[in-house]
Amino acid sequence: MIQRRNFIKTGIAGTTSMALGSILPASCKSETSSNAAQKIKVDLPRPITAMTEEYLGIKPLNLYGGYEEMMQKMRSYRPLDLNAVEWRKANPNKDYSEWARQARERLLSGLHYNLPPVNLQAQTLETVETDSFIREKIEFNSTPWFRVPGYFYIPKNVPLPAPALIVMHAWGGPMLFGADRICGEPVHPAIVNHRAETSSGRPLADWYASKGYAVIVIDAFHFGNRAPRGINGLPNSYDPSKLDNDTHLDYESRANGALHYGIRELNWAGTTWAGINYGDDSRCVDYLLSRKEVDDNRIGCTGLSGGGWRTNMIAALEPRVKATVTVGWMTTSDSQQAYNVNGAVNTFCMLPGVWDRIDIPDMISMASPKACMVVSGTEDILFPPVGKMEAARQISETYLWAGNPTLFRNYTPAKPHCYDQEIQEEALIWFNKHLKK
């Protein structure tokens, strides 16, 4: 009879070897069982760049201590390199459309979120009318398990159907508020402060509606009316607009503390945070197409920070959107991992098996022929200068390869992490050029 200790040494090891042998690439497999115990040498298809302060253009914020070298090696070994620039070098006889198809399939499959058919069952709950627009408080089904709250704007004084924008709130800021951050009169001092810091005090959705756009804004998962309740010390029911400052800060801390729990729950359920966000955002297009006030062929998308990330996803994967403006979320994966993961990369970015195959700029690169503008403030310290510059270079090169060099713009104002009045005006020019012609 096999002793338990020997079984652990031989049985499990042998089983593990067989299992790994069936999934590892040929370069990682040992040739014979006699050298199975020898150290496996992995060829790294990409050279490892030393992510120094000089290279990054800024001092790294959170190097992973003794694990840093291991992380860089892990990133350098690409099981499948679908970065546009690298793929083109390796496949000189293939065209842009083939790369974009493969990259898009990888990104979409990595979301692990298949949207089932659903009846939106949209409702308008209340209406506010101004001189420039009508704002409706709405809700609709994005899936059989999510009913999404938000706002829809009908512009006045313009011919209908009008062009439309999906406007996305940021990740950073008061988590107990989502769409309300950028819609309507501020319902809490936290919103006043957030707007002052990010949008020159303007409610962004109201402003775009006043410029002649139909607009939809929703609460992202874990924000606003979808913020945590009944967990981590949060009550089952509360109205964030009625919280005093101390209670609001306490609830904000508790909601943020539930993030790690949420990502584990979602992954265990077989999906990703990014998948839920993209699913909800894609359903916003369905909602827009259900409205007679919207021109189906003139839909755009924009957002700051986490909203900029979601805009990247829409640019990459949603064919019904024709123009985008990403504000405050563009870099390269390698430089970001070395510089600042903790401050910029959150649950909405987590896609195992994706970012070691494609890169962040590839989301915009695969969007051609959409008209895409990326805004990267030179004073935005969430991202390293080299990451922002290299991302723009890759996207420009890929749009040229796709035959649409004029449909990409990289705008680099001397701004911090914001979507202020100057950026708003530049974004409006971009949307007017591509959605109002």
What do the PLM-derived regions correspond to, one by one?
Residues W145-R147, K156-A164:
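Proline/glycine-enriched tight loop/beta-turn segments at coil->beta junctions
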Residues V294-G303:
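Alpha/beta-hydrolase fold nucleophile elbow
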Residues R393-Q394, T398-K437:
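C-terminal catalytic histidine-bearing segment of alpha/beta-hydrolase fold enzymes
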Residues N6-S27:
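N-terminal export signals
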Residues M168-G279, S335-A338:
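Cap/lid segment of the alpha/beta-hydrolase catalytic domain
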Residues S22-P60:
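C-terminal segment of N-terminal export signals and the immediately downstream linker at the start
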Residues M74-Y153:
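Non-catalytic accessory segments flanking enzyme active sites
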Residues G257-T271, D280-C284, K322-I364, P369, ...:
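Mobile cap/lid helix-loop segments that gate and shape the active-site cleft of serine hydrolases
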